[in-house]
Amino acid sequence: TDEITSFSIPKFRPDQPNLIFQGGGYTTKEKLTLTKAVKNTVGRALYSLPIHIWDSETGNVADFTTTFIFVIDAPNGYNVADGFTFFIAPVDTKPQTGGGYLGVFNGKDYDKTAQTVAVEFDTFYNAAWDPSNGKRHIGIDVNTIKSISTKSWNLQNGEEAHVAISFNATTNVLSVTLLYPNLTGYTLSEVVPLKDVVPEWVRIGFSATTGAEYATHEVLSWTFLSELTGPSN
């Protein structure tokens, strides 16, 4: 039988039951707040149930799609840090280094023990690993904060960013689309050999960080659907 995991959170509740909060993450009426506009914070929120993302017996990998709306709001609209991610990590995942590491990684060198894939929405230029053009960007990260693929992105401060992320298990392509209400859009895709990177069972979630500069990072809604094909007996 196929394993299907599906959930939809059209808006968050103060006592949201199916989330695990880490660092500064919490829910209020209708939204998930990862960071407030204060310096040097890390906030994360995970879906409470582990997800079976691949199966060692069959070798099968799940197809999945997740959609969410997030808002980054910096008080002055200009000095913004550090960014927001959707990530896939081991079931026992804990907050990692803050600041430019976005709460999901601890270094810029490839670390296979991290077993983490993230899609980052990076608002602050870290010269040691970010694209040399110095621009804000969307990135796909595999076991390191240094993205394997990036797309420059103009943050619309305080606006709702509508995101869809999907993984095609046949092609191993991870695709990201971001759309603002004024129809400015961005797309990015890259091959990610998921079963060579993450454990069979994972947690999924969001993280956000601030540093010397800051912003509020909020999620307004979240859906997820994965399908892992069972043995073909």
From Swiss-Prot:
Cysteines paired by S-S bonds: none
Coiled-coil blocks: none
Chain sites annotated for binding Ca(2+): 122, 124, 126, 130
Manganese listed as a keyword: yes
Gene3D superfamilies (alphabetical): 2.60.120.200
Subunit structure: Heterodimer of an alpha and a beta chain.
Family: Belongs to the leguminous lectin family.
Name by which UniProt lists this protein: Favin
Species this chain originates from: Vicia faba (Broad bean)
